[in-house]
Amino acid sequence: RRCLVEHGRLTRERAGKPYQQLWGVIQGAQWEDLRRRAARTMADMEADGQRFDGFGVGGALEKENLGTIVSWVCEELGEDRPRHLLGISEPEDLFAGVAAGADTFDCVNPSRVARNAAIYTPDGRFNITNARFKRDFTPLVEGCECYTCTHYTRAYVHHLFKAKEILSSTLATIHNEWFTLRLVDAIRASIKDG
């Protein structure tokens, strides 16, 4: 409640400047009663005409329960404001989050795994440092239109990782981020098409 009051004061102070949204983060670990209560409390909270502009679903979400936990929260929040799922880990988590009602996501995992030579593909991920890629002059993923796949080969990215060149993780990150964005685009198109 105090943050809403302070946000209202700061918003008035910043009159004429772009509006800065305030989002509430729903916690409660794997406990349904805590998650639902936190979601209801934050959804109903208002102070001086201020209310949260959206909600983040945060905390330690166990992978096998991610969809269930997000659905508890989304059932309590309604659909009048966006629901953001914080810190998902793998691309398949996007599907569970969307199915449970999350609208947006963030994650460092595409770059984190890229720094360790993991490359996302439609069939899962692979480690580009494996010896079989030493002389593989195809793109990281055939048909991918990211900068890395259109300019470099598996063999070259493999070489960069083996040589411990910083460019290796940059190129892998570019690909993994592109892959993740295209996956979200495909999910969005699928929802739009029914």
What are these regions (language model features)?
Residues C3-E6, A38, I69, N176, ...:
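Alpha-helical packing segments of well-folded alpha/beta enzyme cores
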Residues R2-C3, Q21, R51, F179-L181:
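Generic detector of bulky aromatic hydrophobic side chains
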Residues R9-Y19, I187-D193:
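Surface-exposed helix-capping loop/turn segments at secondary-structure junctions
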Residues R1-A15, A131-K134:
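Non-catalytic, usually N-terminal nucleic-acid engagement modules in DNA/RNA processing proteins
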Residues V141-D193:
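C-terminal extensions of enzymes
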Residues K17-L140:
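Glycine-rich phosphate/ribose-binding loops and adjacent secondary-structure elements
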Residues R1-R9, I26, A99, R182, ...:
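Charged/polar positions on well-ordered alpha helices
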Residues R12-L22, E92-D93, E142-Y156:
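Electropositive, surface-exposed helix/loop patches at the edges of structured domains
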